[in-house]
Amino acid sequence: MEALNALMFQGALLSDSGRLYRLQLPGGDVQVVERWSGSERLSGGFEWWVDVLSTQAGLPLEAWLGRRATLYSRLADGDESPRTGLIHDAYALGSDGGLARYRVGLVPWTWWLSQGRHSRVFQERTLVQIVEAVFADYAPMASWQWSEETSAFLAQARPRSHCAQYRESHLDLGHR
């Protein structure tokens, strides 16, 4: 009976109702946020680290990598403000007394563009064709589109005779 009461108490503590923050993970699984921190930069993306508590040890952390997760912050009026990113790192911090603690790192999809160096040559391709070819590898995680304001400019852009990507990241090529 005492063990059952302890489990019910833990379940009540780990409810996300009334909490300021909650993290929705792949598959709709919601975790209670213990704390979170991060940084955001203009033209540089963001990185958030979220510590969550769970009654389950051994959550499938590897399966979360590259998947979308949303950190919700409850506002003063009761509405929620979402911050969505892709999980680039997840690991267990330890467990104690039936609670497991995990840390999850969230970044924008463009972070993956910075991972790795590539070399390739584009010939007689427009800017649109080059960018779309580079971003095609990231289609499952990418969330982007050309803005309407750029359509007139892009329609006038002539093909480039030669554009080389030599040992640089896709992000660096995109910035260039």
Language-model segments: residues:
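Amphipathic alpha-helical and helix-coil boundary elements used as assembly
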Residues: M1-R176
